[in-house]
Amino acid sequence: YLDAMTIGPDKVNQLRHVKFLKDMPTVFDHMQRHREILAPKFACVHSHLEQGLQGMGRWTQPEGGYFVSFDARPGLARTIVRMAAEAGVKLTPAGAAFPYGNDPEDANLRLAPSYPPFEEVDRAMRVFVTCVQLATVRQALEQA
């Protein structure tokens, strides 16, 4: 199977999926296990956003998927990513949800809590909230 290159989807990987996810009850069971892992992480993100960033941005509360979309005030996304990196938190690049990563407002960030362990999500969100707060206050002071 693996010695020939093909154009198109990976047929061997598709076969693995078909054998693993045999029927719809198996798919639903597997997705429920994903929910049990992901739901607390997304709840953590939402809690930090609600408690720390009211009036400083907008965000989605997805019922599926792997990202929370956060819109800071215009002109702050790259600054927030830089500040978080300086504090040791790696965020998805600013504007990643836009074609070629070009967000004309420099406002959008995608938060991706699905991969790290819960404790890291919690710590990273504390840093993220602090960076958004600091960047927002600095911008307001510069514009005053």
Please tell me what each predicted stretch does:
Residues Y1-A144:
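PLP-dependent class I/II
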